Amino acid sequence: MRSFYDKKDGYRDTIQKGLATTRNIGNSIYFPDKSKEEIDMLKNALENSDSVVIGAGAGLSTSAGFTYSGERFDRYFFDFARKYGIKDMYSGGFYPFPDDETRWAWWARHIYFNRYVKASKPVYEELLALIEVKDYFVITTNVDHQFQKAGFDKNRLFYTQGDYGLFQSLNKRNQKTYDNEKWVMKAMEAQGFVKNENGEFDIPQDRKISMRIPSGLIPRCIDDNSDLTMNLRADNSFVEDEGWHAASERYYDFLKEHKHSKALYLELGVGANTPVIIKYPFWHMVSNNKNAKYACINYGESFAPMQIEDRSICIDGDIGEVIKKLI
């Protein structure tokens, strides 16, 4: 039997190639013209492409309504904000809570409202309607499961950075992941959240909720009784389980199959935090395939190397609004 590391690894292979490409780019960058022409060009590129590779970052989920600050945070984390001074969901994930009961109460909410509820805007569904007739594949750094919720084929998805819906053991010898849905639902009930008319947890009318879960609800590994943690890539302890490696291999095979085809590399909401996973590899693949095109839709961060300017489409704007114009 082959080990995980003998398999074709689309994740690391593309990162290495992308980094090699950036060394030749320098500061030569192409910025978009904010005109309707770019949207017409993208519509034409979609219609004439043989395949579409979607690279999705946090900006896509933000466009769909998954904001980590503002109204959503104020509604569901008002008590944590008041007591601990936490400003948003992202920074709260790093807060040194006083005990495990409080820390896991936070994470139960964080997971639930960013993984087990549906996005407030149909951006993912409209994206699927746009590309579902194409031969497509999705690579994403998002961990909120929204592609599958919208109906994308799970065999065409590669979640590189983990999944809010999975735990992993702190025992490094254990390279498995564990579904956390049942635990999350129990932990939400334990804090006093109630189901609304849509069957989703919400704040009760009296706004009385707890910032702690019972000690008996602190999650433990069913296999080795070790402490559990989130299956999110933060360091080299991140568990790349069998499903992760299978998805990486499918990504590798898809890219190889379409290496010389009329492929559209469609980048959505990828910021500066993780360009090595999607942005740089996409630039590499377009640079090395004269039949390919690169498209980038992002709010305030839409650009491409001058080397592929003639085959690049950069749109500065809200992803959801742009998709509506493309359908």
Predicted feature residues:
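Conserved catalytic alpha/beta core of Sir2/sirtuin-type deacylases, generalized to analogous enzyme cores
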Residues: 1-327
